[in-house]
């Protein structure tokens, strides 16, 4: 099978990268489309074919002309529609050639299936769903579904125009599937395949749980600085712990730098000695460090299913999460983790205090159940096979 993965960036997220490798190892021809953002030397070993959108002006023009000529020879019946549609949506000639590259590359690869990873791509490059002669799958993820169309009515209407043209949808949680249904994604076309972790993660597993009665509770959150991640409420909860004389250290591991409002809040609450912010750790380093923490908290307002939570559960790190998005699909309160209401720093502080007083036998039972949840339902091998079934499904 010739599989195209339209990710927009190469390399892409860890889950998608692992999916590419598994597809290739099963003998499928895999093409990945995007702008190169990092090293991809391992693609060659795995026979993964990167289709890179060039940045250089001359390269952009040359590639666009090459693609147009290829399609004039092999797909003459469609090229005029494609070029007209591309031209209508462009601001200038450079933008026209750039859009040609981003739209036409999948058309020359004779794909059996094109899997678009981000919902906004079907709006920005609608030709991919209107004219391509193969099955089109769209992944429904995070803010593209839960936030963007809610605050942007124009985007919501465009989703309603283009979602009905998609053959199948992949949702990372049932909650996102229900939300996407508001914009024209029919429920009978949606397959729910949760994010997953590679089974190699268990080599970092620490069977000896970190004791909670140590001098200082070591807490961690993982995720970029963005209002939807709820860090302001997490810091308010830390301020409550500080006021009550509870010893703790809270680390935020983020892919971007601290925002001004968070920095102001840190200073205003005088939390500088209690909080550490780490930027730019690779996922491998994050996984290595996770077992050193007593507790992971997810204070988000919206999530599909958090990869950081999956990794923590696999590594037997207890998790307190807000009951947002699809998190209650993985966490069962007091069974394999803990759920609290969103936007409630008092409840978060209370749950942390309950955790501190909890017996080690109870914590052991929680992390045992969390680890088993991952082994039963959230391993990458299972999800890759489910994804291939969507690709092969003739309906």
Predicted regions mapped to residue ranges:
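A short, well-ordered alpha-helix in the C-terminal region of glycosyltransferases
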Residues: 354, 361-377, 383-389
């Amino acid at each position: 099978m010739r599989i195209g993965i339209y990710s927009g960036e190469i390399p892409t997220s860890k889950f998608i990268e692992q999916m590419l490798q598994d597809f290739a190892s099963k003998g499928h021809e895999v093409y990945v489309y995007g702008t190169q953002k990092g090293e991809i030397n391992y693609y060659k070993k795995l026979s993964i074919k990167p289709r890179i959108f060039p940045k250089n002006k001359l390269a952009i023009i040359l590639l666009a002309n090459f693609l147009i000529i290829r399609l004039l020879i092999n797909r003459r019946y469609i090229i005029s529609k494609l070029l007209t549609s591309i031209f209508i949506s462009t601001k200038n000639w450079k933008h026209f050639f750039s859009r040609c590259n981003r739209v036409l590359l999948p058309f020359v690869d004779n794909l059996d299936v094109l899997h678009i990873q981000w919902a906004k791509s079907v709006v920005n490059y609608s030709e991919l769903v209107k004219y391509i002669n193969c099955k089109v799958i769209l992944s429904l993820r995070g803010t593209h579904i839960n936030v963007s169309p809610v605050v942007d009515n124009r985007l919501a209407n465009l989703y309603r125009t283009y979602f009905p043209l998609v053959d199948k949808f992949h949702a990372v949680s049932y909650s996102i599937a229900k939300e996407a249904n508001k914009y024209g994604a029919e429920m009978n076309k949606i397959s729910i395949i949760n994010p997953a972790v590679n089974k190699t993660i268990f080599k970092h597993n620490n069977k000896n749980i970190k004791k909670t009665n140590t001098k200082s509770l070591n807490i961690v959150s993982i995720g970029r600085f963005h209002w939807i991640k709820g860090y302001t409420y997490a810091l308010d909860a830390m301020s409550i712990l500080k006021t009550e004389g509870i010893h703790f250290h809270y680390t935020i591991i983020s892919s971007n730098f601290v925002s001004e409002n968070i920095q102001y809040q840190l200073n205003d609450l005088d939390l500088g000695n209690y909080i550490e912010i780490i930027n730019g750790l690779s996922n491998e380093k994050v996984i290595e460090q996770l077992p050193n923490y007593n507790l992971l908290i997810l204070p988000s307002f919206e999530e599909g299913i958090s990869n950081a939570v999956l990794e923590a559960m696999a590594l037997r790190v207890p998790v307190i999460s807000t009951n947002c998005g699809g998190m209650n699909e993985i966490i069962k309160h007091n069974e394999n983790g803990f759920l609290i209401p969103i936007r409630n720093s008092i409840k978060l502080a209370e749950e942390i205090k309950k955790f501190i007083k909890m017996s080690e036998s109870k914590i052991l039972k929680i992390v045992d159940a969390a680890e088993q949840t991952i082994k039963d339902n959230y391993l990458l091998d299972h999800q890759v096979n489910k994804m291939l079934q969507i690709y092969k499904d003739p309906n």
